[in-house]
């Protein structure tokens, strides 16, 4: 999994998260999809704050955090959230486990930096995970429903990457991969083909299936 929030490993000086209504509202999604993603993000936000609270408890007792315990808690809580929207298949199970290890490891390494247990980080992670998981769910549902084509829909705003602007509007068979910069992706935020983190982090592009 790509370490999306620590790509540059720099100190965060301003908020990275965006209010959920704005973050998802600007995406080219149906109202139903937007509501699902807002709901997912709100639940995942609570999960992240719970995990940060566990770290705080360990710190208050001047104890070293139990890596395995916190990872297992995050895995279980993430699965509960995702399970409200889809069945947890092998792909999602593996992704959630790798994500959880990554988050806990990064938090332990950066306990002295307030950002890593902040509301902003919780929200930033939550909005990204809503898109990561539900983009995958949407792709699987499109295949099951017999869709055969897909089109990459980019944001076309000042935050958009040039590589995403370039692929925007591209239509290909549903089982083919988009060429995004130097990466191959089945859909936005997909890392199953080894896409670079720089093409995944905070991506708000979407896909239309036909």
Label each region the model flagged.
Residues 1-141, 145, 209-210:
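N-terminal leader/targeting and assembly helices and adjacent pre-domain segments
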Residues 120-210:
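Acidic, glycine-rich two-metal-ion catalytic cores of nucleic acid-processing enzymes
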């Amino acid at each position: 999994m790509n370490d999306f929030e620590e790509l540059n490993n720099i100190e965060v000086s301003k908020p990275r998260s965006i209010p959920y209504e704005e973050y998802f509202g600007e995406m080219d999604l149906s109202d139903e999809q937007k509501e699902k993603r807002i709901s997912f993000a709100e639940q995942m936000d609570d999960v992240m704050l719970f995990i940060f609270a566990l770290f705080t408890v360990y710190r208050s007792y001047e104890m070293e955090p139990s890596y395995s315990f916190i990872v297992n808690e995050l895995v279980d809580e993430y699965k509960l959230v995702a399970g409200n929207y889809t069945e947890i298949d092998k792909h999602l199970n593996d992704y959630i486990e790798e994500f959880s290890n990554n988050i806990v490891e990064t938090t332990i390494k950066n306990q002295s930096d307030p950002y890593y247990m902040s509301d902003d980080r919780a929200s930033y992670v939550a909005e990204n995970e809503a898109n990561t998981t539900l983009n995958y769910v949407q792709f699987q549902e499109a295949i099951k429903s017999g869709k055969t084509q897909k089109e990459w829909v980019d944001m076309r705003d000042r935050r958009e990457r040039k590589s995403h602007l370039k692929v925007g509007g591209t239509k290909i068979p549903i089982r083919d991969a988009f060429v995004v910069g130097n990466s191959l992706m089945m859909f936005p935020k997909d890392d199953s083909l080894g896409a670079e983190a720089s093409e995944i982090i905070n991506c708000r592009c979407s896909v239309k299936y036909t």
